[in-house]
Design a protein with these regions (language model features):
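N-terminal signal peptide c-region/cleavage motif recognized by signal peptidases
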Residues: 13-18
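Short N-proximal segments of mature Sec-exported proteins
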Residues: 27-83
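Positively charged n-region of N-terminal signal peptides that target proteins for export
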Residues: 1-4
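Short acidic DE-rich linear segments
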Residues: 19-24, 125-128
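Compact alpha-helical subdomains of small soluble proteins
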Residues: 64-128
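Sec-dependent N-terminal signal peptides
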Residues: 7-8
Length: 128
């Protein structure tokens, strides 16, 4: 009985540690042109966020609500980047992870900028 249980545990452990081949990907498979497209889409996303942050309507809102509205406004730009990943046959798991990381990082930066802007307004110094 102990041997059967031991073999079952070993078999289960092997199955649990087996690599999922469809999610396995190596970064060397992307061409330089694809990398440039991804970088261009990332630039467009950050440019969208930056231009939205400059709008007066967002400057007058609470910084949390304004940041949320800005991120929702620029979300379609990330769709273009997702399409680039799909065309390059990058697994969805990896593409989603990168997009989530970039979205979170940009949200943090925008939130920090909006907090600074609001603090400067409350202090009486208007940023230029």
């Amino acid at each position: 009985m102990k041997k059967i249980l031991f073999l079952a545990i070993l078999l289960f452990a092997k199955m649990a540690l087996a690599d999922d081949a469809k999610n396995e990907w190596h970064n060397t498979t992307l061409s330089d042109a694809t990398i440039e497209k991804i970088q261009a889409a990332k630039y467009e996303y950050k440019k969208c966020v930056g231009s939205e942050m400059q709008k007066l309507a967002y400057q007058q809102q609470d910084f949390r609500n304004a940041t949320d509205a800005i991120m929702k406004q620029c979300e379609p730009v990330l769709t273009k980047m997702r399409e680039i990943y799909t065309e390059a046959e990058v697994p969805e798991v990896i593409a989603d992870r990168h997009l989530k990381q970039m979205r979170l990082q940009t949200t943090r930066e925008a939130l920090q900028g909006m907090m600074f802007s609001e603090a400067a307004r409350k202090a009486g110094n208007k940023p230029q």
